């Protein structure tokens, strides 16, 4: 019985760790995507303003 309890405890801890790691990876991917869009948006606007000024 003692081994059974320790085994279930280890499995539960392992599952929690897996869930934690997956959530961190997903959140990191989301944050990187947001930063990527944000930093792509800024140079695009700058380039557009420069182009407009050059055309004028």
UniProtKB/Swiss-Prot annotation:
InterPro entries: AcMNPV_AC110
Purpose of the protein: Plays an essential role in the process of oral infection. May participate in the crossing of occlusion-derived virions through the host peritrophic membrane during oral infection.
Protein name, per record: Per os infectivity factor AC110
Species in which this protein is naturally found: Autographa californica nuclear polyhedrosis virus (AcMNPV)
